[in-house]
Design a protein with these regions (language model features):
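Expand to "…catalyze enediolate/carbanion chemistry for C-C bond making/breaking, isomerization
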Residues: 2-532
Length: 532
């Protein structure tokens, strides 16, 4: 690879072709360079703080509310405010920043499209550059796509509001280096989206809106507040022009929701229940605690007390501060089989009804075919209102740390373990092949599901847990099942698809991250090394 330097501070390893030159303009690169040099050292300190915090929990401590910040939790204050075009978010659709998906999502019967550079995108260089071009074209109203049959996809006149989800603090952008280290992917995504689109967004009465993933502390939220304020000052924009919704999808963050809202109060408009990553984080954070091992992932549903407490506390905290409380993802995919489709819709409706009844202001779907059914539930719940900010849940008893940490009963089954293996291997294979959003067994899977699958098995091995049939989960048992399930995958997909894919590499990575002595933080980190 040729090293191409287009900035005094940053080095780019990829040749700057026609696509790159549209996005990596000299002024855009200068802005990115300023952000990287100013904010990367503190980002590195924040990642080091995560390691120290986890070491304390591994040694026996449990996450808890922070005594030093009690005054923030107990005093009365609210966030700065919510822009008009974000006051109604009853249904949001999520998906990667691929051209056809961007058009279909913006045209769906939803209020918001969360365009994703994170868990549903495998961030190869071409995908992140194309993603920036696609969002720029969508905002300018010029995006179109033609399929092989000649069908043209274009935006309808009144598309959904666009929110951009950037990569988490831990993810690097390896194709750009600063001082011989990959720059933060989060700053790469933020800088280029903001730089190219802020003027057009403001001109049409919207703004630069972001979703922030994987936050673990209020200090990380404060870092984002500084990044946003720097960008606003650099472009002579009023404070609070940039707005963010932050995902509460890690166990440490659930104890710091007031503090996170307070640290980002100029810019934040809401929090979101990132339920699948939250379950993954629960397993990962409490991995050394044998009394907090979860059962099969299929039985860990939002009705379980520890997850219901998380949802209720998020709603109560957000609405007290004037912020939105967004519900979690419905990962189901509609089916062409009418009986299966009825089952899917009933599952989704029950889940979304519970969220609406709890007081959520809106919710997430992964497929436009669910939009009408979910919209209908929230239309009825809102009854003419735009949101449920008035639902304060003041009558609720306080949610305690013990409730948030309480494991849930349930079986660990051989079928569940085998299903975990098949889903994780197929997802990893797709991800390292460049596809981060994958339909598997009727669910639209992203990285969170594979993370739950592999961390569950790691923890069962680590604590020598037994399956319901009496078998102890060991590395040897896992390796045996992995070999057997690879044959099942081959049979399900067919020899041609299997041989053309990267299933052997995916199985090796699954084996490595599931049997390692120490639990690897995110499968996307070793996975990224296998991505172009």
């Amino acid at each position: 690879m040729t090293q191409q330097t287009v900035s005094a501070e940053l080095a780019f390893s990829q040749p700057l072709g026609e696509q790159e030159q549209q996005i990596l303009t000299p002024d855009a690169v200068e802005f990115l360079s300023d952000l990287v040099t100013r904010f990367t050292p503190q980002r590195n300190r924040l990642l080091a703080a995560r390691v120290a915090e986890q070491a304390a929990i591994d040694a026996g401590e449990l996450p808890d509310f922070i005594s030093e910040t009690a005054s923030i939790r107990e005093s009365d204050w609210t966030i700065r405010g919510i822009p008009d075009d974000l006051l109604d978010r009853r249904v949001e659709i999520t998906g990667p920043v691929e051209r056809k998906m961007v058009i279909n999502a913006l045209n769906a019967n939803v209020k918001v499209f969360m365009a994703d550079f994170e868990d549903s995108l495998a961030p190869s260089w071409s995908k992140v550059i194309d993603g920036q071009i696609n969002l720029r074209d969508a905002i300018n109203g010029t995006i179109s796509w033609t399929n092989e049959a000649g069908k043209i996809y274009q935006l309808k006149p009144d598309p959904a509001v666009l929110i951009c989800r950037v990569r988490g603090l831990h993810l690097p952008e390896k194709h750009v280096t600063w001082r011989d280290e990959p720059i933060p992917g989060s700053l790469f995504d933020f800088a280029l989206y903001f730089f190219h689109n802020v003027d057009a967004l403001l001109a049409k009465g919207s703004g630069p809106y972001f979703y922030l993933p994987k936050t673990q502390s209020w200090q990380e939220a404060a870092w984002w507040s500084e990044v946003f304020s720097f960008a606003e000052d650099r472009f002579s924009l009023p404070r609070g022009t940039i707005k963010a919704t932050l995902l509460i999808e890690t166990l440490p963050a659930v104890f710091q929701m007031d503090e996170i809202l307070h640290a980002l109060r100029d810019h934040i408009v809401g929090l979101n229940c990132g339920r699948w990553d939250y379950i993954f984080s629960y397993i990962k954070t409490l991995k050394n605690h044998p009394d907090r091992v979860l059962p099969d992932r299929q039985s860990v549903t939002m009705e379980k007390p520890f997850l219901n407490a998380y949802s209720r506390l998020l709603i109560k905290t957000c609405h007290r501060r004037g912020a939105f409380a967004m519900g979690g993802m419905a990962a189901f995919i509609p089916s062409k089989d009418s009986e299966r489709n009825d089952w899917v819709l009933n599952k989704v409706k029950a889940d979304k009804q519970m969220e609406a009844d709890n007081g959520h202001d809106g919710t997430w779907i992964a497929h436009p075919g669910l939009a009408d059914a979910v919209m209908d539930i929230f239309d009825k719940a809102l009854a003419g209102r735009s949101n449920q900010l008035s639902v304060l849940r003041e009558e609720d008893a306080s949610v305690t740390a013990a409730q948030l940490l309480e494991s849930c009963p349930g079986e660990r089954t051989e079928d569940g373990m085998r299903a975990n293996i098949r889903v994780a291997v197929q997802y990893i294979e797709a991800w390292i092949s460049g596809n981060g959003c994958v339909p598997i067994y009727g669910l639209m899977e992203d990285a969170a599901t594979a993370e739950i699958s592999r961390t569950s098995i790691w923890q069962w091995i680590h604590h020598e847990k037994s399956l319901s049939n009496g078998q102890t989960v060991t590395r040897a048992l896992f390796r045996q099942m992995l070999a057997e399930e690879m044959l099942v995958i081959q049979e399900e997909l067919g020899d041609r698809r299997f041989s053309q894919g990267r299933f052997d590499e995916a199985a090796r990575l699954m084996e490595q991250i599931t049997t390692s002595e120490t639990l690897i933080d995110f499968l996307t980190l070793p996975g990224y090394r296998l991505l172009a």
